[in-house]
Amino acid sequence: MTNIRKTHPLIKIINHSFIDLPAPSNISAWWNFGSLLGICLIIQILTGLFLAMHYTSDTMTAFSSVTHICRDVNYGWLIRYMHANGASMFFICLFLHVGRGLYYGSYTYFETWNIGVILLFAVMATAFMGYVLPWGQMSFWGATVITNLLSAIPYIGTTLVEWIWGGFSVDKATLTRFFAFHFILPFIITALVMVHLLFLHETGSNNPSGLISDSDKIPFHPYYTIKDILGILLLVLALMTLVLFSPDLLGDPDNYTPANPLNTPPHIKPEWYFLFAYAILRSIPNKLGGVLALVLSILILMLFPVLHMSKQRSMMFRPLSQCMFWILVADLFTLTWIGGQPVEYPFIIIGQLASILYFMIILLILPTISLFENKLLKW
């Protein structure tokens, strides 16, 4: 009798994806972040579901319903902070996952890569709408500022913004629809994740050397299942440490003040994981230019397969490209820092220089260095 694992129509899909999947023998801990992102998504959907049971998406009661969750619901404070800080862990894993893809040339699987970029956009949209739901000061003003950016679109901009708002300002209609979208998007993300994995399993995983690993594969289970479990334990440890010791470390104190359209906070800024893009947006004095730069700062990831000039796939054996890659990482840290600072000297000029450097490295410096390294191989 053949094993049910290999014959049952449903179970065999799971078997081919997580058990008998041939995996390269040399993939490092940088390959753990895919599974960690899966765990983050599950945590977010579950905690979000329980929060939605007690939350009300009405401007009059939204803020007090969140207070009610934290004060009166059994372990409501835990669920709420796991959800809020789970988003931070999600983005940490996302950035590391994308960084791994850039470093090791995983973007040459361009269907997988492009679905990944779409996923990044979807997660960012979900996180933005989720931040609006508690209806604190930063929720309200963040929603106002970010949705207002669409008014920079020529001709249809203002109409589009009012259509998204459902009125002439961010109000009840906006909150209700944001809650609806925030609820549905994670399920769309889950479907996209399945497509992402489908395309990945068409080609198999990349590995640190960037070389074809068909001649040396090992089964995913038990080798990488046990490795993933270690990663998951560390992720949960980090998340629960954050939740139980300093749950408000990454939040904004302004969001503990109920939304007031008549009182603008002194510094409107998004959550930390959007600060790099926010800094790029602010570094251009023109509204439409800023919005384009903001979108391009993420969309530029789709250009990496086209901009790959090296004869080698991975950066493992390319010290000059490695150096530029880490300068790019440092630049992103700089942009994140600038995004959280007020718009004044010297932060304005630092932000502008960091923004120029960001696009320069990706569009010009990395491809040029790759071509130079190709020449070095001949000498």
From Swiss-Prot:
Q: What is the effect of changing residue 306 to I?
A: In strain: Isolate MVZ 152779
Give cofactor(s), names only: heme b
Binding residue positions for a ubiquinone = 201
Source domain of life is: Eukaryota
Co-factor: note = Binds 2 heme b groups non-covalently.
Q: Which residues bind heme b b566?
A: 97, 196
GO-annotated molecular function? metal ion binding; ubiquinol-cytochrome-c reductase activity
Binding of heme b b562 occurs at 83, 182
Q: Where are the transmembrane segments?
A: 33-53, 77-98, 113-133, 178-198, 226-246, 288-308, 320-340, 347-367
Does the record's keyword annotation contain Mitochondrion? Answer: yes
Subunit-structure text = The cytochrome bc1 complex contains 11 subunits: 3 respiratory subunits (MT-CYB, CYC1 and UQCRFS1), 2 core proteins (UQCRC1 and UQCRC2) and 6 low-molecular weight proteins (UQCRH/QCR6, UQCRB/QCR7, UQCRQ/QCR8, UQCR10/QCR9, UQCR11/QCR10 and a cleavage product of UQCRFS1). This cytochrome bc1 complex then forms a dimer.
| Annotated effect of mutating residue 238 to V | In strain: Isolate MVZ 152779
CDD domains xrefs: cytochrome_b_C, Cytochrome_b_N
Q: Where is the signal peptide?
A: none
Supply one GO CC term from the record.
respiratory chain complex III
Q: What is this protein called?
A: Cytochrome b
Enumerate the Gene Ontology biological process terms: mitochondrial electron transport, ubiquinol to cytochrome c
